[in-house]
């Protein structure tokens, strides 16, 4: 298990399709079937969602970026996300400033580097982003570069997020052991369908609980 996803995603896709079939056979919504088997029959009917956007594309100016983020807010989202690292640091900060003009009380911005930064760049962004009350700073470096992730806690005290591109319980455990993630503020983003399916995902959740994560 582990690696960069070709095997785990294929198996996870099949696994989730099988679970969907089982739910159809039993005549239940899949969320209720899983709650019956793993959640004492009590599904959580409220989940956290956010609107991801803020990509880079030709012709996009700050006005269009603000319009995009405003459209998410108008649809009821309280957390929105934009990409970083596709422009210079200074330009990314200007883009963030533009979005901040749109957000009101109770609304927050996440930023996502999609693993593109080396350590020096990740630190430079961490220092610059510290001036904002961001919801999180996501995946600054390669998801398997636990040393980089751990180093950032010395430069960024606000919430960070990673784990979306880790695909097994072993990878998740190594992130907890060596990545410097903080249970009181940081976010772990493991994805069931990408992580060999439900069985491996449940193993990952159990490991997190053992290490003090909710």
Model-derived features with residue positions:
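N-terminal capping/lid subdomain adjacent to the active-site entrance of alpha/beta enzymes
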Residues: 1-109, 114-123, 127-131
């Amino acid at each position: 298990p582990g690696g960069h996803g070709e095997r785990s995603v294929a198996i996870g896709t099949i696994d989730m399709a099988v679970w969907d079939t089982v739910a159809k056979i039993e005549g239940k919504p899949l969320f209720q079937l899983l709650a019956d088997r793993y959640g004492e029959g009590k599904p959580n009917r409220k989940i956290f969602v956010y609107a991801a956007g803020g990509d880079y594309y030709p012709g996009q100016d700050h006005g269009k970026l603000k319009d995009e983020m405003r459209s998410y807010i108008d649809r009821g989202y309280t957390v929105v996300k934009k990409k970083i690292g596709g422009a210079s640091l200074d330009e990314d900060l200007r883009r963030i400033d533009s979005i901040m003009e749109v957000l009101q009380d109770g609304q927050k911005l996440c930023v996502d580097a999609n693993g593109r930064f080396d350590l020096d760049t990740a630190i430079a962004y961490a220092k610059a982003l510290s001036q904002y009350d961001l919801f999180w700073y996501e995946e600054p470096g390669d998801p398997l570069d636990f040393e980089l992730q751990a180093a950032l806690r010395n430069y960024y005290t606000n919430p960070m997020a990673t784990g979306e591109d880790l695909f097994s319980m072993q990878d998740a455990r190594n992130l907890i052991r060596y990545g410097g993630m903080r249970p009181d503020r940081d976010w772990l983003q493991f994805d069931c369908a990408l992580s060999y399916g439900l069985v491996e995902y449940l193993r990952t959740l159990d490991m997190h609980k053992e290490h003090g994560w909710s």
